[in-house]
Amino acid sequence: MEKDMASLTFYGGVGEIGGNKFLVEDGDTKIFLDHGQSFSFGEEFSTGWLSPRGRFGLRDHFALNLIPKIKGLYSEASLAPTDYPYVDPEFQGVFISHIHYDHNAHIRYLDEGIPIYLGETTKRMLDSWETTGIGRYGKHDYRTFKTGKNQVIDDIEVEPVHVDHSTPAAYGFIVHTSEGAVVYTGDFRLHGPK
């Protein structure tokens, strides 16, 4: 049987600020790079005091086309109020580049069985947000990494690389597939040492 080609699919973060959701597939391996919320998220339907109702999981998000319907990605609890069927996870991981909401806000809806990879410091910040109530991400299989510690997931190897950004512990990723490398910068700025 011939192996499928590596591919890259953009579900957000193209032609907009934030909302990065980039899917990398190689053979049977599927990983996301970030899973955030766009800066313009729902602005045509809501305001600061009127937004998708959290108690309805993804129902409002799907009805208003604010988040993509992707089979095997979302938790059963998030899908329960919707007519979208739950299926077992079909993704092997989600890599979060840094703590900013436009790169991680929608991990709260992901199936708990999908590992979430993030830098050690980003994980500590996320934990503090959970503790203080700033963010609600839920229980997940969090796996931390450091620069120089590549993560191998089936057919894909992800190399985390520190980038300069307005928050500590920001990463870009070099994603090694069977057909070559994909470089994902996350967010970066051109300050600091060269």
Set out the residue ranges of the language-model regions.
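His/Asp/Glu-rich metal-coordinating catalytic cores
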Residues: 2-16, 20-93, 102-194
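An N-terminally biased module of ancient metal coordination in phosphate/nucleic-acid-related enzymes
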Residues: 96
